[in-house]
């Protein structure tokens, strides 16, 4: 089953529940924990949690980051711009890896599987590692609303810290 994008005519996978991120219900503010969810279950849940309006700013993410104690001791390389971000990140990962650095790479969006977004030392994150990171974030956030992307970014940082990377590259 897929949902058509009116603008592009492209199809995107619908969630198993049939809810797409746009128009999905908001989080009701009740703190619930969901142990035992698979990665697919977490991703579907994160799509439903996405607020209908995005609150600009970094305050919410900072509060959750602080609650988790995510203070990386390694350098962060942020690659931004319009074109070439993915290639630049891949080059940086390869160059730094060849120089003996243990790299963390976070990219978005993924092409086939969510796991592609988070890599440590060139290896995609496992479902179990992603689920563990999402569980930590969910427990720490309390009633703070986070977007799908913010959950993913915090999850990547948690994995990079736990994985002992020397440098992280963020697209």
Tell where the protein language model's regions lie, with residue ranges.
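Short active-site-proximal "capping" loops at secondary-structure junctions
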Residues: 83-85, 110-111
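Ubiquitous "structural anchor" signal
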Residues: 17, 26, 89-92, 112, ...
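A cross-taxon signal for low-complexity, glycine/charged-rich
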Residues: 1-26
């Amino acid at each position: 089953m897929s949902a058509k994008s009116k603008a592009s005519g492209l199809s995107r996978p619908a969630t198993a529940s049939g809810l797409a991120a746009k128009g999905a219900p908001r989080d009701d503010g009740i703190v619930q924990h969901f142990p035992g969810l698979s990665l697919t279950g977490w991703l579907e849940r994160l799509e439903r949690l996405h607020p209908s309006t995005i609150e600009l700013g970094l305050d919410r993410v900072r509060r959750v980051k602080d609650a988790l104690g995510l203070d990386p001791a390694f350098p962060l390389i942020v690659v931004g711009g319009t074109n070439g971000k993915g290639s630049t990140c891949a080059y940086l990962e390869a160059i730094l890896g060849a120089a003996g650095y243990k790299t963390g790479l976070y990219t978005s969006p993924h092409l086939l599987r969510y796991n592609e977004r988070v890599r440590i030392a060139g290896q995609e994150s496992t479902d179990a590692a992603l689920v563990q990171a999402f569980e930590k974030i969910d427990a720490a956030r309390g009633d703070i609303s986070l977007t799908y992307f913010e959950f993913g970014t915090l999850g990547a940082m948690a994995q990079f810290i736990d994985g002992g990377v020397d440098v992280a590259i963020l697209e």
